[in-house]
Amino acid sequence: MKLDFLINILLSDKPSKNIKFNEKQIFEMIPELSACKNFNQNNIWHIYDVYDHILHVVDGVPNSLALRMAALFHDIGKPFVYTEDENEIGHFYDHWNKSNEIFLNFISKYDLNEEIKNTISKLILYHDLNIEKLKEEDLLKLLNTFNKDEIIKLFQLKKSDLLAQNKKFHYLLDDYKKQQ
């Protein structure tokens, strides 16, 4: 299957609808995505399984290849790092690294502009970063890692990610608005 097929879906008006319509082909291209379907996250932050959460995030970001591709892969590693604590609460430690590994493995089969590939990778790796708790030196490192456009994309991804979670935590958007 060609990358253009996936790109056309991601850049459509309602990517989630087109992903679901072409689910068999998408799962053949990205088998790890099928592991996300019906994978319950078992924590108060999430109201959707991993797959539906991903689809909500993809729909929620602006129409940009880097953003939509990052949204598609941002939590794809969760089923592979899932643990539960003694209270049966689900945790996904280091899922951003696993998600990025899956993305890099996937994209290595295709010819995609290096700059876009690097932006997607950075967005996946940093999407779960708790920006408001960063120390000054960490914030400076972040600013050296991302250009201005990428910082904007990171906040757009984080916003869509938060909006696709439990509404009890949407108040955290106020923090993002202050930081932008």
Residue ranges of predicted features:
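Charged substrate- and nucleic-acid-binding regions of tRNA-handling and nucleotidyl-transfer enzymes
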Residues: 1, 6, 104-109, 162-180
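Residue-identity detector for glutamine
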Residues: 25, 41, 132, 156, ...
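Divalent metal-dependent catalytic cores for phosphoryl transfer on phosphate-bearing substrates
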Residues: 59-168
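Acidic/His-rich, divalent-metal-binding segments that scaffold phosphate/diphosphate chemistry
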Residues: 1-91
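Exposed alpha-helical structural elements
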Residues: 5, 17-18, 25-28, 32, ...
